[in-house]
Amino acid sequence: MANGSGFAVTAWQGHDAAAVRFSAATMGDMDAIMDIERAAYPLPWSCDSFTSILSRQGLQCGDYVVQLLWARPPVGTEAVQGYFVAMLGFEEMHLLNLAVHPDFQAKGCSLLLLQHLRNWAQGYGARVLWLEVRESNRRAQEIYRRFGFLPVAMRKHYYPTPEGGREHAAVMQLLLPSPGGDTLRPV
């Protein structure tokens, strides 16, 4: 089923795909984004960071893509349940942030966001998706692996920790087929 942006969406945890849609984030979505960011992460991005990113959305190399996942749960009204932030590069996209509200984690929202990201990247002409994930975040790493991302490197002391230290990041990549059907080889 199409979600209005031309991309296919699968059902959400057994619910009709019509209960799910995506939209580009705007400054008017800042409260919802920050609520999710603060609930999902012990060290959330700042409002200033999101303001800067939202003002630089576009389709050129170096621009950002910020997409919101709207969902209508079985009981309740439609609301933003998650989002991703990605940066466009030459034939690549870099996932910078993916967050799902804790009340909607483990319900397939991350996979829907990743599916939408992959569709976006392929529509843009990307051949590879990149991301970094905390070494300690095994749950996220498993979600990324299940989606097809492979670990390719480690960034030492990449993330700050709540205790004031630093934590390594696993670098993961997902190779995408080109319009001609061929796929790059892993690094």
Model segments located where?
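Conserved catalytic-core motifs of GNAT/GCN5-like acyltransferases
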Residues: 2, 7, 130-132, 145, ...
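Intrinsically disordered, low-complexity segments enriched in small/polar residues
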Residues: 39, 81, 142, 156-157
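Short Asp/Glu-rich motifs
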Residues: 56-59, 140, 163-164
